[in-house]
Amino acid sequence: MNYIFITGVNRGIGFFLTKELLKRGHSVIGTYRKDSDNNKLQKLKSTFPKTLNLTCLDVKEIEEDELTTYLNSFKAVDILINNAGILDCGNVPFEKLQIDDLSRSIEVNTLGPMKITQLLLPKLSESASPRVFHMTSQMGSIADNQIGGYYFYRISKAALNMFNKSFSQDYPHIPSIVIHPGWVRTDMGGNHAPISPEIAAINISDLILTPNNLSSGNFYNYKGEILPW
């Protein structure tokens, strides 16, 4: 059994990934925002009372001392999944963008995962087989950008990818991977997305639980295929 820390578990990919990992017998430490609808999450907690641990956390406003104290109740964290993210402003034309608003996307999609990873380093170091995964997007690939647009989302995810690459070089004993989960039917992905969140959760679980098939520092899609930077 692995102890798995996941951010943003109250909806979308985070919720179904949590559910899938619990069904597979793992223990999940999940974070959710105070202002989110947690009814489904509380029902899941009642189904897995011993293996689902929940804590309120906003990746934009992390109370470091509070999170550190909470984490001290766990011996180690084996897997960190930085899942929380936003698609801010969507595909607004460049000339209409409020450039200062980029900071919100950077705070959530880039700085949030960096802060969480930093705070969890001591607990990851106590694991016999630590691993770090970040939910990124193919839209963060510079080489794959053939249509432009989505400035804030692309920039923040490209920055996350670079953080992961540097981290993998500095901490070779902690494999670190960025994963593109595919276009998933969530509030962010919309109703026309071809992949259900349940299937996305299965795909991602298969990837993160077979670490020997992945090389640290790389950028993978949900099929385990390497994507271009």
Give the location of each predicted region.
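C-terminal helical subdomain
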Residues: 178-181, 190-229
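Catalytic loop of short-chain dehydrogenase/reductase
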Residues: 86, 90-106, 114, 125-169
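N-terminal Rossmann NAD(P)H-binding glycine-rich loop of SDR-like oxidoreductase domains
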Residues: 10-20
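Rossmann-fold cofactor-recognition segment
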Residues: 45-62
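Structural signature of the Rossmann-like NAD(P)-dependent dehydrogenase/reductase core
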Residues: 6-7, 82-83, 130-137, 177-180
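Conserved Rossmann-fold cofactor-binding substructure of NAD(P)-dependent oxidoreductases
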Residues: 58-75
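Conserved glycine-rich Rossmann-like NAD(P)H-binding loop of the short-chain dehydrogenase/reductase
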Residues: 24-39
